[in-house]
């Protein structure tokens, strides 16, 4: 065969056998599947660790929401570069670089753990010596202990000068967002360009199915790591007197990011050995060469036509502005844009604080919440997505039919979500916050609850948080505020029991030597509601996933074919900015307003929340999601109306063209698909529905 026809063949023998092995489309698919698993794994680990990060860094929910939104911030920083230059560069290597950056970002997120020092769940005076602390009620003492002593606070502040180390977590999450950006668009375009004709959809479906392994692994890993104490391997775990049920417990949140970071770096390696264009069959090479010969010299060397180059820049700018105006004046596109923005905002905001909601409402640990959501919810969503795609194909739904189907599934999920209002639990019986200190009467406000007769003689530190559960089922902020005079326990401060608690004996009990034990009282009354919650969560996840597979199809069919890329890009920009970044922040800010007891940092500043008003938390969490979901249903009705009106307008055009052809002697004006054989005169006409 003539060498001039295949100039690349002369260089082929120079390739090493190792490179030949990597010159395959299947290897790219396998590596891309691995990267999908890694990026989904990292996302779930971040969401699952939000509460742990709040406690470890002593930050409110609004700051943790900003940290969570850092992923979208990083994504937006490079999305324009990736969208424009990605297809022109070496796509596999660019994806590999993204995976490597994603791994570095994940490791950076965990880095503060190694230089912050040990986690202190109690103040310095609590852990120094139990005999010299303010744990028990000190009667007739001259020293006032209504607050932490300045000496101890200054000492602790010097040790804990890590007030802004959470910024490293934010930067790490931003790096994860930067690294994730090229994976999906370049991976999908690579498959679409080089897969055999008709196989692209099968490959993409398989890819998304395999990606579901990531969330399942993420939930299981988070469940295991949440049981481990944050400083595991550094401290004697027998000396840790708090349990995962305690509001101060911090699990080994950093382990998940280390594991995910290493996996991301490993999955980046194969991409660097893949070619820019995969090895193809000889037939495909011949077709490619034939197409190459058909190119004109002007196409190959645009410099030879300077007039075209001079006119290109202003023409591109004018074309871009016209295209942007076209999609923003497209009412079908704008309605769908607002609709999906509300959907994404509701989903991201509620999912970010889902684990906190379960912990505060039903008294479940982070480990239990992660395990149940991973084992039950994710498989349910996977089956819903598969069934949704099957039903649409089986029923051969049109675009209008698909929109009605999604409207039905969204309505069903909305109805079941309303039932969450019935599952909101009442506040804990907490003396000094929801009840008077004697545990007998509710209080109107949790701010500055006055001392009772049972502990008015005690000299207590009100900033101290060492909750104890009395025999009466009431939780007290500390043994001192429970009026406990003595205690019994081992030297490691484990299984301590306090006695002669005057406030416990005043709660409808006979006077006597009543006791209290370390830790909050369990919320047994909410266990039944928790099982109902899990059931409704599975149903809601199923209906949500059932209709989610069609959202992208509605989007790309709402604009003209030549504006598809711009429409998808603008949609992604708006949704990521207003949904992915802002939703966790305003969800967190509203949740912060329900806090009844804040921790106090070593420097005396406000830290993380110890206890929320459960009822108010539930009303805001569920109510905010309902407030975002309600307009969605109205917008779906408007979208269906606009689609029907557009279909009617298209039908009228077909009839007019039919009469025109009939007048000219053409008896069959319409093709088999029901559309006119002659293109419409209107340049701005949309894709037929």
Curated annotation (Swiss-Prot):
The intrachain disulfides are: 454-484, 460-480, 469-503
Q: Which residues carry this modification: Phosphothreonine?
A: 662
Q: Which GO terms describe its molecular function?
A: bile acid transmembrane transporter activity; oligopeptide transmembrane transporter activity; organic anion transmembrane transporter activity
Which intervals lie on the Cytoplasmic side per UniProt? 1-26, 87-92, 193-211, 276-326, 393-396, 557-565, 644-689
**What keywords sit in the KW lines?**
Cell membrane, Disulfide bond, Glycoprotein, Ion transport, Membrane, Phosphoprotein, Transmembrane, Transmembrane helix, Transport
Q: Where is the composition biased (Basic and acidic residues)?
A: 680-689
Q: What highest taxon heads this organism's lineage?
A: Eukaryota
Asked if the record carries the keyword Membrane, the reply is yes
Tissue-level expression reads:
Liver specific.
The protein's job, in short, is:
Mediates the Na(+)-independent uptake of organic anions such as taurochlate, bromosulfophthalein and steroid conjugates (estrone 3-sulfate, 17-beta-glucuronosyl estradiol, dehydroepiandrosterone sulfate). Also transports prostaglandin E2 and L-thyroxine (T4). Shows a pH-sensitive substrate specificity which may be ascribed to the protonation state of the binding site and leads to a stimulation of substrate transport in an acidic microenvironment. Hydrogencarbonate/HCO3(-) acts as the probable counteranion that exchanges for organic anions.
By what name is this protein known? Solute carrier organic anion transporter family member 1B2
Query: What species is this protein from?
Result: Mus musculus (Mouse)
From the broadest rank down, the organism's phylogenetic lineage runs: Eukaryota, Metazoa, Chordata, Craniata, Vertebrata
Which gene carries the instructions for this protein? Answer: Slco1b2
